[in-house]
A protein has these predicted regions:
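A mobile "lid/hinge" subdomain adjacent to the ATP/sugar-phosphate binding pocket shared
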Residues: 199-231
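Conserved active-site "lid/cap" helical segment
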Residues: 10-32, 61, 75
Length: 231
């Protein structure tokens, strides 16, 4: 990780260096607890004490949240080493979507694979969608609303909300799917991957980089920018 002034701008090495945390948060001992907005874990959602068991379940989904889970896990473990007696609590982005009905949450793959590997539509940006739905209910002074909420940023998602509950969302097992993102492709025909592998010889690492970093607005603009304002 790179420290620019007191702003952390990269995440390679920072959590192995306690002195950097000390310089940013010089009075760690004054903290009663530390809260994290965490992203993804296999079979775990909601608000959780970040025990080693929960961290292992987060690590089990590193493959589907590679840009998020590894640095989060490293940060949590660094705080634990500095504050061994302080509760560490995580609020998962997937929490708002955890109650989606089966017809929205399940993928049409063999059900035994879904059950064995905890494959389902988890959804993300939950705090954002929940806030929007609550704001709309307060503004309109009613709770019996059917809404489509939109989270727009470097990545984006839509959520169908009925009476304050998420009933469907565009993101799924990973943050890769759904609407087009700045660099991520969003939903595509899965056979594009097989076709590209056969035609170009690209392997899994190259295909992963293509989908995660070279697609979306960046890819469709021919590499001009991942920012719609520039395009």
């Amino acid at each position: 990780q790179v420290l620019e002034g007191k702003v952390l701008i990269e995440h390679d090495d920072i959590w192995g260096n306690a002195t950097v945390l000390d310089s940013v948060l010089p009075e760690l001992s004054a903290l009663d607890c530390v809260g994290f907005k965490v992203v993804h874990a296999r079979g775990v959602t909601g608000v959780q004490y970040l025990t080693e068991d929960v961290l292992e379940k987060m690590a089990a989904f590193n493959a589907v949240a590679p840009a998020h889970n590894p640095p989060y896990i490293a940060a949590i473990r660094q705080f634990r080493s500095l504050l061994p007696d302080t509760p560490l609590i995580g609020a998962f982005e997937t929490a708002f979507h955890a109650g989606m009905p089966p017809e929205a949450a399940l993928y049409s793959i063999p059900i035994e694979l879904s059950r064995k590997y905890d494959i389902r539509r988890y959804g993300f940006h939950g705090a954002s969608h929940e806030y929007l739905s609550q704001w709309a209910a307060d503004a309109m002074d009613r709770t019996d609303l059917r809404l489509v909420t939109c989270h727009l940023g470097g990545s984006g998602s839509l959520c169908a909300v009925k009476n304050g509950k998420s009933i469907d969302t565009t993101m799924g097992l990973s943050l890769q799917c759904g609407v087009m993102h700045n660099n991520r492709c969003g939903d595509i025909d899965p056979y594009i991957l097989f076709y590209l592998a056969e035609e170009t010889g690209m392997g899994l690492p190259e295909l992963r980089e293509l989908l995660e970093k070279k697609s979306g607005l960046y890819g469709m603009s021919g590499g001009i920018s991942n920012d719609l304002r520039d395009i």
